Amino acid sequence: MKKKITLLMMMAFAVVLLSGCSAVENKEGMFYTVFVKPFDVSLNYLGDLFGGSYGLAIVVITIIIRLVLMPFMLRTYKRQQGMKVKMDAMRPEMEDIQKRLKETKDKEEQMKLQQEMMGLYKKHEVNPLNMGCLPVVIQMPIIMGLYFAILHSPDVQAHEFLWFSLGSPDIIMTLIAGAVYFFQAKVSLWTMPEQQQKQMKLFIYISPIMIMFISFTSMAALPVYWTVGGILLIIQTFIGRKFYSNHPEKALESVEEKKE
């Protein structure tokens, strides 16, 4: 159900994006006013504040975005750690069912064991697919808003930051962004129960490949955003893992609150 809701939200956002993009260049319309203008104003203000360094302005904006999203991210880690504690508690029963399921060839017996497994999940109130997609959904309009603010700002596009131009693709930044998100994807698995880790292993490769594919033909400002954001995500993951691994009772509070 959650996957369907997420897909619908993504489609709805795409409709808003397509209907608003034509007006962005003229700085009018709902899409520009809600998503692009805040970044347009922020980029110019911070660029002036840092002596014309729009690259540094993008770094600071990314840090601010990650700090705003941090409570949502930590809540997701908290929920995942709570699930992990419950999965550990039910592991002996789960492994016994899995062993019997592997040994039997009888279709009817397999159906019974699968139902028994579902009953075990229900008994312990565990949903192995409960990932928490809100932080991802929130980021979509943020990334697009920042991208269009840069796209229609000649000053930002012409700015030289470090060794590259913010308005042109840069292969080195593309590779750095991909490497950061590969490591971030691996680190993110640490907060998940073992069952979720198996389901999400492919994500380790899909995420950085998508980042590099988009960055390869986009302005270097985009992989700058992703690189800084990815590093901050890694730090947030370490914070969430350290706190909730050392305080499993706090993680379980999240699961109990959700029940109520």
Question: Which stretches of residues belong to each language-model region?
Answer:
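Helix-loop-helix
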Residues: K2-K4, M9-E260
